[in-house]
Amino acid sequence: MAKKSTEKTELDFENTLQQLEAIVTRLESGELPLESALEEFERGIKLAHLGQERLQQAEQRIQILLQKSDSAKLSDYQAEE
């Protein structure tokens, strides 16, 4: 269990993304045995969630900073479909 908390504090967004991209590359190669592919996939899901948490934290920090400053307004992001 200590590994999870240590992992969360050690990985910043860039490292999380880099590891996730490496996992995707290995999975897309099709050369991993099934059990290894499942383990990599599970790790990738955890990294994706961690990356989402990091992005949400950054967005919250930006919103707080902009609320403190009347000179800039934050508008909601509209994804193109």
Curated annotation (Swiss-Prot):
Out of the domains of life, which is the source?
Bacteria
An example Pfam family from this entry, by short name, is Exonuc_VII_S
EC numbers, comma separated: 3.1.11.6
UniProt catalytic activity? Exonucleolytic cleavage in either 5'- to 3'- or 3'- to 5'-direction to yield nucleoside 5'-phosphates
Cell location: Cytoplasm
What are the recorded Gene Ontology BP terms?
DNA catabolic process
The record's section on InterPro entries has: Exonuc_VII_S, Exonuc_VII_ssu_sf
Query: What keywords are assigned to this protein?
Result: Cytoplasm, Exonuclease, Hydrolase, Nuclease
Which cellular component terms (GO) are annotated to the entry? cytosol; exodeoxyribonuclease VII complex
Subunit field text = Heterooligomer composed of large and small subunits.
Q: Which family does the entry's similarity section mention?
A: Belongs to the XseB family.
Q: Sorted alphabetically, which HAMAP family does this protein's record hold?
A: Exonuc_7_S
The name this protein goes by in its record: Exodeoxyribonuclease 7 small subunit
Q: Which organism is it from?
A: Pasteurella multocida (strain Pm70)
